[in-house]
Amino acid sequence: MSTAKKPLVLVIMDGWGYSTKQEHNAVAAAKTPNLDRLARDYTSTLISGSGLDVGLPDGQMGNSEVGHVNIGAGRIVYQELTRISKEIKDGDFFQNVELAKALDSAVTKGKAVHIMGLMSPGGVHSHEEHIMGMIEMAAKRGAEQIYFHAFLDGRDVPPRSAQSSIEQFDALFARLGKGRFASMIGRYFAMDRDNRWDRVQQAYDLMTQGKGEFTADSASEALAAAYARDENDEFVKATRIGAAAPMQDGDALIFMNFRADRAREITRAFVDSDFTGFARAATPALNFVMLTEYAADIKTACAYPPTALVNTLGEWLAKQGKTQLRISETEKYAHVTFFFNGGEESCFTGEDREIVASPKVATYDLQPEMSSEELTDKLVAAIKSGKYDTIICNYPNGDMVGHTGVFDAAVKACEAVDHCVGRVTEALAEVGGECLITADHGNAEKMLDEETGQAHTAHTNLPVPLIYFGRKAEVLEGGKLSDLAPTMLTLMGLPVPPEMTGKPLMILK
C-alpha cells in the first residue's frame, strides 16, 4: 500500500488585502482568531499583487484572473490590458488582421458595425480606451453605421461613475461625425458567469432586437432614469437608446472585453450553434470577433490569441509525477483551473478538480459565508485522503462580498473564511501537511471610497498577506504573486523550472 501523502495546500483568500487604515476595513473589523494566531506564531509577510509586479500598468489594481495567472506561472505575466494599450499607442492595434477583416467585410456590404463591452476605466475586464480605439478604427475604415452597446460597471469603479465615461464617448462620436450609443445595460446582466441565463437573455435580446425594458433618447438620459429608479451602474436594466439598431445578417460584432470569465456566456449566446441557455428569438449571422480567447471551444475569430505559457506550476508538478487537486466554488473555479494553468482548459496528468456550487442569491451580501463550509468539508476530506501532494483552494468570500459594498456583510465574509482556515490548518496538523495562505488582490480591506463618499466596491492595489504554516523558515521580503510557485516547489523539495523567474520566499532553517 502506498504511503499517505502529506499535502502542501495553497489557500487563496480572494480579495483579502492588507491596509494600515482601520476605518471601513472589513478585514481589520472582522474577528479572525485563526489568521491572527497563524500570523503571530508562524512565518508571515506581505507580498504585492498589483501593478508592474503582476504585468499590469504601474499602480493598476490587481484582479482575480491576473492574480491566478501570475501565481500559477511563477513569473510575471504581462496582461492583455498592458499589451493592447501598448498596441493602441504604437498604432499596431489599428492593423490587427481579425479586426480589420470584420470591419472591411461590413463596410464592403454596407452593413453595420456593433461594438459591445464594459464601458469602464477599471482595467479589470476591459478598458474604455480600447473601446474608443475600436470605434476610431471602424470610422477610419469607412464604417458609416457604428453602434456601441455599453455594459455599465459600478463594481471595479465607484457604483455611480458611468456619466464621465458617457461624456467621453459622446465627445468621440461628435468628433468622428459618426457612431452612437445603441443600448445600455448593467454588467450584472451582460457579464454573468454562473449560468444565470435569464440575466444574459436580457442583454442578448436588447442588443440583437433592440428589446429593452426602457428606452431613452441619449445615454445620459438613460443613466439619469436608471439612477431615478435607484439602480447603480452594475444593475442598470436593459435600455434601448435612440432608434432601434437590431443586429442583421452580415453585421460585424466586436466584443471588447479582454478578460475571459465574464465574457464567455454572452459570447456563447451569439456564436454557439447548439446553444441551450435560453431560446434565442433572433440569431443573426454576424462576423463576431472576440478581443481575446474566452475559451478554446468558442469557435469564432479572435483578435489577440493567447501566448502559450510553458511549465506553469500545474504542468511542472505533472512532469514531476505529483498529484494535485484544484478546488473552489463556482465563482472562482475558473481561476484555480483555467487561469492558474495559464489559460489551459484541460487537466494535467494527476490533476483532479472539484467544484462546489456558489449559493443562488441575487448578491452575496445576502449570504456572506457563501458555500465556504461545504468547500472546507471537501478540502479537509482531500487533505485526509492522503491522495494529493498539493492542493490549490480559493475562498471567494472577501472578493465577492467586498464587491457588494456592504460593510457588515464583508466582515461576516472574512470571519467565515477565518473559521475555515482554522479547520484547514487543524486537518493539516493531523496529517503532517503544510500550508501557504495568501490572497490574489485586495478588496474587503477598503469598503468606502473617501473621495466620492460612495461604497468602495472595487479591488485595491494594496499588498496581500502570506503566511507559511509549516516548518521553521525565514522569509525574503519584497515578494510578489509570481514568487509563490517557486516557493511551493522549494518547500516540496522539487526543482524550479527555468521558465519560472520568481524566487522562493521561504528559506527553511
UniProtKB/Swiss-Prot annotation:
GO biological process terms held by the UniProt record: glucose catabolic process; glycolytic process
Cofactor binding: number and manner: Binds 2 manganese ions per subunit.
Residues that, per the record, bind Mn(2+) 2: D14, S64, D440, H441
Pathway assigned to this chain's UniProt record: Carbohydrate degradation; glycolysis; pyruvate from D-glyceraldehyde 3-phosphate: step 3/5
Residues binding substrate, per UniProt: H125, R155, D156, R187, R193, R259, A260, D261, R262, K332
InterPro entries in UniProt: Alkaline_phosphatase_core_sf, BPG-indep_PGM_N, Metalloenzyme, PGAM_B_sf, Pgm_bpd_ind
Catalytic reaction equation(s): (2R)-2-phosphoglycerate = (2R)-3-phosphoglycerate
Record-listed E.C. numbers: 5.4.2.12
Assigned protein family: Belongs to the BPG-independent phosphoglycerate mutase family.
Function according to Swiss-Prot or TrEMBL: Catalyzes the interconversion of 2-phosphoglycerate and 3-phosphoglycerate.
Name of the protein described by the UniProt record: 2,3-bisphosphoglycerate-independent phosphoglycerate mutase
Gene name of the record: gpmI
